[in-house]
Amino acid sequence: RVAQIGKEAGIPDGVLNVLPGYGDVGEALGRHKDVDAVSFTGSTEVGGYFLKYASESNLKPVALEMGGKSPFIVLEDAKINDDLIDNAINSAFWNGGQNCSANMRQIVHKKVKDEFLDKVIKKVKKLKVGDPLDLKSNMGSMISKGHLQTVDGYIQKGIDEGAKLLSGGVSNNRQKGFYAKPTLFDGLKE
């Protein structure tokens, strides 16, 4: 659908191509001399391959987003139902957001943004943070005190830069363990 939107926006055929696949697809793109640029989101290891492929072919520009944190994109025709909301929340907060595929950015079309945010905020505020062995907990602790401090630093930066805090915020460290609050912002700067 993203490529279709690009076409509808007037991007000529062949300029924007979305080709999901595995290593052989990426390598073919990275090494092909007629491919003028490549953008990749994924692991640091695979990102390194794209730099190698570019250097061995036509020195094409390579845009890399390595280590994950891919966006969760909600298009204007999306049905804002429980499945979508649950997927949006789980993709961001599963394992405390401590995995490379966590969708820490949610890009939502303005047509459905209010409905989406309303439903997400209501469900996020109900998440129980606590001992991961407690079946009533939805989100466990950060891996270490240092990681919690890093997460709190990012949250504070969002607040300081004027993003609208919708839920959560900097942890209060009143619980035993390194528990971050499930936090939502709107209007973050790049």
Language-model-detected regions and their locations in the chain:
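Short, well-ordered alpha-helices that flank and scaffold nucleotide-derived cofactor binding pockets
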Residues: 4, 8, 31, 52
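Beta-loop-alpha module in the N-terminal Rossmann-like domain of NAD(P)-dependent dehydrogenases
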Residues: 20-28, 42-49
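A short, aliphatic-rich alpha-helical micro-motif
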Residues: 30-32, 174
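Glycine-enriched alpha-helix->loop->beta-strand junction motifs that scaffold or abut catalytic
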Residues: 32-38
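ALDH superfamily catalytic-core signature
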Residues: 37, 45-190
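PLP-dependent aminotransferase-like
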Residues: 1-26
